[in-house]
């Protein structure tokens, strides 16, 4: 009888979700001496099939030192890195440390995304070292000096053979506990003699640091019923995404 009563009490509840309102998604990284490239897409509902919705009518403008350039819609893949872009301008900007650069993206739906970035200085890598254990496996140690007069944020990456492949290490950090000190990033005993490693140290803005952390949180929460939903922390206004500059030092070493 109790089982029958329990069955009678079951009800199907239909949850009505608000309609998804698509936003412009912008990703643009400035590199000194490199052409201007950007990705502009459109957000889709979580329940939609995976897709990359292009926005052909989106216009991208970048302003530096009072001069504005327009990035043309011209989708392509960078053969070196394997990354895709939707807009480009082939002439690099003459970027100096401390320069402020702005971006504006708009389309025919009257959507508008804006953002700004301040060009940072590169932080030199002082040493890339390795040491073998008794099993002939080596760990990697990368060292640099933190500036005591600034609040600094870093991204550290290592690749094997090519930056076009997935990174072996990729993490962000700040100098709250290491301000003004010599900082060293280590690894596990992952390497052997003859391995070619590409080490990259990025000096990044706090906005990019927060963006990367939020991306990591969102990946960890995706599909996990026990995780809190995670919101992407954007550096742009009016949409989703990141506009920043990449100031990095890169070294290639062969483990010997």
Please place each PLM-identified region on the residue numbering:
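Sec-dependent bacterial lipoprotein signal peptides
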Residues: 1-5
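A sequence/structural signal for flexible, mid-protein segments enriched
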Residues: 7-256
